[in-house]
Amino acid sequence: MSFTWNQVRDVVDTVLELPAPSRHRHGVVFWLFLCGLTQVAAQPWQNSPSQPHPTSSETGGWAAKGLGAPVARDPIFVYNDWSAYDELSDNIPLTEQLAMKELDEILRLRKFGVRFDYYMMDAWFDPDGGYRTWRKPYWPDGPDQWIKKCRENGILPGLWFGTNLLEKINPAPQWQDSLNANKGAMSFSEGGFLPHFMETLQYWYDHGIRMYKFDFADLDAATPETEKTKSKEQIRSANVDAFRRALKKFREKNPDVVLAAFNGFGGDVESTSGPFPFRNPVDLRWLEVFDSLYSGDPRASDVPEMNFWRSMDIYSDHMVRRYEQSFLPLERIDSTGFMLGNTGTIYYRKTSAWKGAFLLMMARGGWVNTVHGNLEFLTDEDARWFAKVQALYLGLESIGRTKTFGGIPGDVQPYGFGALDMEGAVYVVVNPAQAVNEIQMPQLSQVQKANSNGRLLFRDAGFEPKVTGDKIRLGPGQMALVGYGRYASPAYDMGVQTDVRIPRSIQPVDATFSPAEKNTIQAMIVPPARGDLRIILQQKGSDGNIRRSWPGGPPSGISMGKALTLHVSQGGKDIPVEIAYDKIIWSGLSWGVGEVRRGSFNLGQPLTIRCASAEKDSVALVGRVYEVEY
């Protein structure tokens, strides 16, 4: 038996509006909503555990091959085990035991209605196998059991490839005549690398692989002979054309594959303060062969926030906007913004502020929705919440549209993502500024009804946003979810994110900073009559542009709390400063934010604030101070 989306929504709305005793009597119906959404018509991704994905002819339902689009036919959900393991900035290897444990976690989450279509295996290969063999110490019998269990449970397996860069892999004999001068990468347009690489992709397709992730591409690689005779532009053009043609042929032969592009295919993802348009532009012809292009691994933006994880949200939001401005459709951008894990690559986040990160990933409108990391960190109750958000947005992505609005996140302007269908709209709105701001939630289409009677569905703790008509008032650094039309219903309430706390008020404090010694600024202020102090340090280079400090990644790097320091004293006595950025951060950081609690200083005596950078060459530091009340 199957249901339409509208039938499911009607059931949910009806059950949730019943009195409590009736809700209990109708609990089976509500459980079907939470756990049985995979039976909704037009969503045949989940089948009997022992059955593979059916074809259209077998079910009479939806099948990708029945559509005309050559790529990106429908939203999908991907699990990737990167950040559950980490061998680059940590020492946790990718073992068969770890991978199979996460597969069991996928099956656990499915019981609560969570959808996964693909399992992407990250760096799996033996360094001497030319992408044909798995690492023996960790995969003694190869991948067969993993592939078999995935497919038995209706999950399609995928593999990560370092493309033509020799990242933790040695050149196979067939690649030797494609190597560049430093023997770190292979040309796509010369020698035997590309033919052998494409044969390898086909080899894995024939073994059941259906998704391929291409990372670390070096499109400027050329043999020493070619480097002497051709320009960099000619070399790059030849590589792009050769690889794109090869992927086209591969897709034509295997039309059900999903191909995802990561590092190396365009865009500047190091920070949110870089120039735009991108210095490394995105070649839109890649959309002919890739289902998605990613917009950067999670990292802090150059927007200072007391909550470190919110600055990371802003980074992913900013990069999606920049890729959209580079003319990529939102559905083709993989924001890669949601990672769980206790590893260096995700800054030992575990599940901190995970709900806001997940909501934002869904709200950005990408059709390749990737979840990374330790799924066991999600409780059963978390899984129910996850499934509820997923069901809301997968319906809107599949049937409706997603659009951006407001300012550019990295420019510290309020912004958001809106999704609509003919029955209503939902808006995720973010205020990145150190001020209370109001932002309009515009109509997303001419056929959309005017926004009125909106409902606040989700928010951070602390400041209580106020929705008035088509506007919302947000606290500093706050995000919220608002529903209109059908979605302005208790059925879509998502609760409060308690591990992100927003001040109920914020006011600037008069503070004049002046140089004290090298890479140090100092100010003396009169303590405010009430509230805590928030101190913000921003680092710039001698050219006036935002500059990140890079004191090394884990495990041997220096903590950012030592690289960018905030110090407060009163009468010669040190005052504690609470910070959340004291982490070893592989991606660098350009700011520091800290707070001093009101009870730790005397009101009648001035405070001395010192902000410093450990950079060896001269930098420019900017300091700001605010009074905040929680």
Predicted regions, residues:
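N-terminal secretory signal peptides that target proteins for export/translocation
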Residues: 1-24
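Bacterial N-terminal signal peptides
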Residues: 28-39
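Conserved structural scaffold segments of CAZyme catalytic domains across common CAZy folds
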Residues: 43-168, 367-410, 419-425, 432-437, ...
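Active-site-proximal substrate-binding groove within the catalytic cores of carbohydrate-active enzymes
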Residues: 80, 243-466, 471-485
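Hydrophobic alpha-helical scaffolding
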Residues: 92, 96, 136, 190, ...
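Aromatic- and carboxylate-enriched substrate-binding clefts and catalytic-loop regions
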Residues: 115-338
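C-terminal beta-sandwich/jelly-roll accessory domains of carbohydrate-active enzymes
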Residues: 402-413, 422-423, 429-630
